Amino acid sequence: MKSIVTDKIKLQKVVTDLPKNKSEEDVISAALFTALKKEKGFGLSANQIGVDKRMCVINIKEPMVLVNPKIVKRSEEAVQYIESCLSLPKTMRKPKNTVRSISVTVETDNLGTVEFGPDEKDKIGTEGHNYFADEGLLECVVAQHEIDHLDGILITDSIRAYNIQRVSERKYGRNDKVMIKSPDGDTEFIKYKKAVPLLEKGYQIV
């Protein structure tokens, strides 16, 4: 049984892609689901159990394995959510407020294109609607959470912290990680100091 990694320095490393190897995928996914079941969680990334490969699992509607997942599209709409993380014990006692895209499109090596989003999108934000009970939205948030892990991003990082200011008004440190969007719609995570010159070329912080 692999233990859950809690060392932030290790967790902030960007992992490498998993080479095509079905037997290795099966071994890693089995270890992930075993750890996930023990911890009673919703999702887990390979680097959370000490395997620095781009792979994660989700278990909400049904068990799902994502090999080399990459978010290729995000909705413009976002939602404030509350998240905890098995690798950050303090957040299990005191969850963090975060902001997540309402829907995302993920490309994977094993499942092809996967769409994540709420089951009742038209009800999100309406009076009296408990969107925390929407399994589709929960699955979407967990997918973003786990893919963040693979990119070395934690829910305690400034990029994920809930902030009522508009993005354009936020203040970033030179080494803070931000997500930028190119004029072509591609997104990637880079340090703010590297993002600044790109803003003049039509890139946006999202």
Model regions and ranges:
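Positively charged
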Residues: 1-206
